[in-house]
Each structure stands twice: as C-alpha cells, then as structure tokens.
Amino acid sequence: MYWTKSKGTGGSVLKEENFVVEEIPSRKFFMKYSRLAGGIKEVQGPYTLALLRKKGITTKDAVKFIQMKFNLKKDGIGYAGLKDKFAVTTQYITIKGEIKDFKTDRIDLTKIGYTDKMMQVGELIGNKFTITLRNCKNPQNMAVMEEIKKRAMPNYFGPQRFGSHGDNHEVGRLILRNEYEKVLDLINKRGYNKNLDEISKKTLKFFIHAYQSFLFNKILDTYVSKYSKPSFEEFPLVGYDTKLKNDFASRQLKKVLEKDKISINNFSIRCLGLRCNGSSRSAFVKVGELNYKIEGNSIILTFTLPKGSYATTLLKEITKNVP
C-alpha cells in the first residue's frame, strides 16, 4: 500500500556508503556562553562533547567499544538517538570524563569541547540524509518527489522497529496476553535458552513497544486506504494511561485491540513489574529540504526528517519496490 499515486523510480541502496545520516542535535549542547547572575560566562562542565562517525556498527555497539577503550562507567556516555548499522552515520555524544581522538575501520571519534549537560535520548531535532539509489528502473519518474513535497509522508515505524526476525511485536502481544510459554518459545527460537525471569525488564518492554508501533502502523494503514488528505493529528501509541476518544484513530485502535483480545489495562503488568503508560505520534510528517540529482540510472537524494521518523518509509514511497 502506498500513499503517493505517482509511479516509483525503483532502485536500491547497495552499500553502506550509499546511506549517509547526519544527526541534527539540540542546539543547547553547542552553547559556548551562558547568562548567569554574575554575568555572561563561558560554559564549563564535566562532560566532553565529541563527534562520533561510524560505519557498519550500531550506536549501542559503538558506545560499548568507547566505554571499554576509555574504561568508562556504563552510564558514562550520553547520546540522543540510535543510528543504523548499515549506514555511514554522524552523531554527537557526551562523555563523562576525558577522552582522546581515535579512529578504527568502523569508528572515528573526535573531541569537540566541553558541555555542562549530559545528552539524553530524544534530545535531537532530526536527521539529515544523503541516500544514493542504484539501478533505478525509472530514474526520470520525479513526479513522486513533487507529490511527497506537497502531500507529506505517512509517519510509519520502519521495519527496524520490529527486529531482524520481524516479529518483535508478536512477542509483545503475547506478553500483554500473559502467554509466557509462547513468549519463551518465540524468543528461544532465536538461539537463546532462557526462562522469563532471566529476561530483563528493559528487553520485555522493548517487545511491548514494538507492539505499540505495530498498532500505530495498523491505524495509519487504515487511514491511508480511506483518505487522500494527510492528517497532522497525533495518533495514539497505546498504553495503560491512554484515553480513547470517539475519533478515527481511537475507533480503529479499539477494533484491533478487541481482535487481539487485549485491553488498555493489559499494559500494566504487575507480576512482571512492567508499566507502559503510552504516548502519541504524528500521523504524517513533512519531508524537509527534499532534493534529488539523477546520474545515469542512479538518484542521489538529500532530505531531512524530524526525530523518530524513518527514511525507509520515504524510500518505500519513492521506489515502490515493496508491493
């Protein structure tokens, strides 16, 4: 199912260097001076601000490597967002303590200065992308680009959200239904051999978040199939604190939850000590600074997306490779 009506270009990302991501962090980490009661003073702080460039490694694995190299505590590094493994990515991190610049074949860390704030997840504005699509069947089909500029983009969660097996949401659904034997069957098929009490709360919550994302995508699917104008409302990411209304998103959510035999109260699981209160997410987002250049049967795309939005969703609309 596609939101745009124009024909796709085809094409694919063939290697990491064809998918470049630059994080746009919160400006507060770059303030060199601050206004205090005693006047304007230069910012000093216990945190080192550094630029992390990486390729072929996840943000979490890169952070673990840096922690080991500089003998840092587990919570000694802060970052705003997680970047994919199959990409060349740039992001800022904060480090409690001193570091030296270093470079490997996958990680390049450069010290920028100091800050008085520890970076937290979510403290970014968005991301800038430079993506090269190779072997495009119809590189001249640029009408789809103009359509996206005018009509915005459905803010689907990308496939990364659902794990390499594509079934993280199914594990989450089973957790919420208290079907713990089935949960263990699914998890242990991946090569593990664990009991439920050996799985961290963080991991269990991760599966529930995948189910929340699955529900959001289902609601958005229904909207895209019914309407031609984008909705710039927020759709629910359901949790125990979600207040269902008599609007489109709430009605669709009720239908899916009833089908899955799950209630709002299921998102608070006392026996596991898990509580997911829920939140909301923009149904559609504007694609910023979308530009393109055709080189033979390749297309070079540049654009920005707000935090939490997936470039893979945009690529699906442009290429129309996925039925």
Language model region names:
Residues 1-40, 47, 55-60, 65, ...:
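Extended, charged/glycine-rich binding lobes that contact polyanionic ligands
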Residues 313:
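Classical protein tyrosine phosphatase
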